[in-house]
């Protein structure tokens, strides 16, 4: 419904990466209410069971083409009280789908789905940009390019890594 909602006067227009500066959960520890409340909310949504979840998904898929056709170039995100370019908003949603598909696969012990490059490439670019904001260029560049120089984790959503890089030699 909100893809076609008007943008309220004075609503901030955020960039793809910049809008994460607005979200409280991005800066909060994983066990903080800002994060646990999201999990609690979606657990409550899923409490009706898998049949209800499949019904909601099927209904949403049926509405998707019309919603996308009616969407303008900018989308207001009411739960963040900001607007994003619709293409950026879609990258955010793709990232959520990819990350949570991996979460689900890991939790039930199966291989995660493989995403086509048109989906995965913008997701990985967003995650790399967010990791850079959290950890800095040196950590991310070394983590992605040189195992022997990596300081360890460079997660886009994890805590900032404080260990010292391993040196070749």
Where are these regions (language model features)?
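Structured surface interface patches that mediate subunit assembly and partner/cofactor docking
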Residues: 4-28, 45-169
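Penicillin-binding protein/beta-lactamase superfamily catalytic region
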Residues: 32-44
């Amino acid at each position: 419904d909100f893809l076609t909602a008007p943008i309220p006067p004075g609503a901030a227009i955020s960039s793809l990466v910049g809008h994460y500066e607005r979200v409280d959960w991005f800066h909060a520890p994983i066990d903080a209410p800002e994060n646990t409340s999201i999990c609690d909310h979606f657990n409550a949504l899923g409490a009706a069971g898998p049949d209800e979840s499949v019904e909601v998904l099927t209904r949403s898929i049926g509405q998707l083409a019309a919603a996308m056709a009616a969407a303008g170039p900018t989308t207001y995100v009411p739960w963040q009280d900001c607007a994003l370019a619709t293409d950026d908003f879609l990258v955010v949603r793709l990232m959520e789908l990819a990350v949570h598909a991996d979460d689900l696969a890991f939790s039930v012990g199966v291989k995660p789905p493989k995403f086509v490059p048109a989906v995965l490439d913008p997701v990985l670019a967003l995650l790399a940009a967010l990791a850079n904001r959290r950890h800095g260029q040196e950590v991310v560049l070394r983590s992605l390019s040189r195992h022997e120089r990596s300081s360890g984790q460079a997660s886009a959503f994890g805590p900032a890594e404080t260990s010292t890089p391993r040196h070749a030699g």
